[in-house]
């Protein structure tokens, strides 16, 4: 257990033990993590979905190692890697211009502030998690702007329709796409509403971009005016990107930061994007994830455990019937060395081969055995589905409901 976490001002998201202390890992390779006791874990967290290729991918590692020696560019100025990364992103995600940043949070903030300046409109209508920046904190009164001019519509298209009645004040609608709790039809209606109102649509694909396919996951559904990607770019290295209309992103010309040309990060992005462009890692992830889900769903059913699984092999989420069962599920998984992202989305990497999957399936079977006291419990209901979706989306899952139901759900979930 780390002795220095109390010195850290932040409280970063990371795997923690039953006493909420950070777990300490000493090594990582492929789909495996090793903790300080020598225990080996199978990693479904993968740095919150940013390790797409697997830990220590040899191609990325070799590129980074070479750049670290000074043999492939310098932090002082431009290198060929800058051009390569820009060209790859443009080919994969489109747009007239592309900007580079160090985190998804920074990229989204820069993108929406640029759009706000370019349009001259004050409001941002938001749905989903856009990073740690306080600008996204919801206001105390639902459907009212916060101090930064952001209004959250919580993925409810009825609320968005109300907010778009005065489109002349709206700089952009900003959404973080989710493919576990929202259907393609939801996105098509969102695009229709934005187009009808003449409002810019920003897709914050920090999490899902490049993971589902070689490009934006909503390219055909939303055709966003501005996009942001990050986690699929560099296999865990600190880089993100913004792209879209030259007019809307013109204010980014003022952006510069000291580590812009840092060669190891650019090398990682270039190497990872070359792989991502083939579609092979995404296919491997989907196939491995789907196989695990088939086993997990059957194991849960055979054990009569009231746990659903939302999503597919690319990203999925456990939906336990109760919070007590949810806590027990993740506790049992920890005991068996399955490192899940507690309460959030699970994502395998392309390093999940036959041996890893076989071991993961055996461990999950033992997880279900540990949960035997919960067999035959109350079934999963809508309250559980909304609660779990809220944990991953910061918003409401797609389901039929009226305005009164929406208001009640928001009051309860925001209070929790």
UniProtKB/Swiss-Prot annotation:
Record's catalysed reaction(s): neomycin C + 2-oxoglutarate = 6'''-deamino-6'''-oxoneomycin C + L-glutamate; neamine + 2-oxoglutarate = 6'-oxoparomamine + L-glutamate
Enzyme class: transferase
Keywords linked to the UniProt accession: Aminotransferase, Antibiotic biosynthesis, Pyridoxal phosphate, Transferase
Modification N6-(pyridoxal phosphate)lysine, positions: 231
EC number: 2.6.1.93, 2.6.1.95
Cofactor(s), by name: pyridoxal 5'-phosphate
Pfam families (alphabetical): Aminotran_3 (PF00202)
Single GO BP term: neomycin biosynthetic process
Example GO molecular function: pyridoxal phosphate binding
Pathway stated in the Swiss-Prot or TrEMBL entry: Antibiotic biosynthesis; neomycin biosynthesis
Record family assignment: Belongs to the class-III pyridoxal-phosphate-dependent aminotransferase family.
Function, as annotated: 6'-oxoglucosaminyl:L-glutamate aminotransferase that catalyzes pyridoxal-5'-phosphate-mediated transamination for the conversion of paromamine to neamine in the biosynthetic pathway of neomycin. Also able to catalyze deamination at C-6''' of neomycin.
The protein's name: Neamine transaminase NeoN
């Amino acid at each position: 257990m780390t002795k220095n976490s109390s010195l850290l001002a932040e409280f970063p998201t990371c795997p923690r033990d039953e006493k909420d202390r950070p777990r300490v890992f000493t090594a990582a390779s492929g789909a495996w993590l090793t903790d300080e006791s020598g225990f080996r874990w199978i990693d479904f967290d993968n740095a919150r979905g940013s390790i797409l290729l697997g830990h220590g991918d040899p191609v990325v590692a070799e590129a980074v190692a070479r750049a670290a020696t000074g043999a492939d560019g310098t932090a002082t100025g431009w290198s060929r890697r800058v051009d390569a990364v820009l060209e790859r992103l443009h080919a994969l995600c489109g747009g007239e211009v592309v900007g580079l940043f160090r985190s998804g949070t920074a990229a989204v903030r820069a993108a929406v502030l640029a759009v706000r300046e370019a349009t001259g409109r004050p409001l941002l209508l938001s749905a989903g998690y856009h990073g740690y920046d306080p600008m996204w904190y919801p206001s105390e009164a639902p459907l009212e702007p916060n101090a930064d001019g952001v209004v959250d519509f919580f993925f409810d298209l009825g609320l968005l329709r109300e907010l778009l009645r005065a489109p002349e004040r709206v700089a952009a609608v900003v959404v973080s796409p989710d493919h576990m709790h929202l259907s393609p039809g939801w996105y098509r209606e969102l695009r229709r509403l934005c187009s009808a109102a003449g409002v810019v649509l920003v897709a914050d694909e920090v999490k899902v971009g490049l993971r589902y396919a070689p490009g934006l996951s909503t390219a055909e559904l939303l055709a966003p005016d501005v996009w942001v990607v990050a986690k699929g770019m560099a296999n865990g290295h600190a880089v993100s990107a913004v792209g879209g209309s030259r007019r809307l992103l013109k204010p980014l010309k003022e952006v510069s930061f000291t580590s812009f040309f840092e060669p190891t990060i650019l090398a990682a992005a270039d190497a990872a994007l070359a792989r991502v462009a083939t579609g092979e890692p995404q296919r491997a992830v989907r196939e491995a994830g789907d196989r695990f889900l088939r086993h997990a769903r059957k194991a849960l059913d055979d054990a009569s455990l009231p746990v659903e699984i939302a999503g597919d092999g690319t990203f999925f989420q456990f939906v336990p019937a109760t919070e007590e069962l949810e806590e027990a599920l993740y506790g049992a998984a920890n005991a068996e060395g399955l490192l899940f992202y507690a309460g959030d989305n699970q994502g395998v990497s392309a390093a999940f081969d036959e041996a890893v999957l076989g071991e993961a399936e055996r461990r999950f079977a033992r997880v279900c055995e540990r949960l035997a006291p919960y067999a035959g419990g109350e079934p999963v209901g809508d309250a559980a589905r909304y609660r779990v979706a809220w944990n991953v989306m910061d918003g409401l899952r797609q389901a039929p409901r009226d305005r009164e139901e929406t208001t009640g759900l928001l009051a309860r979930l925001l209070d929790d």
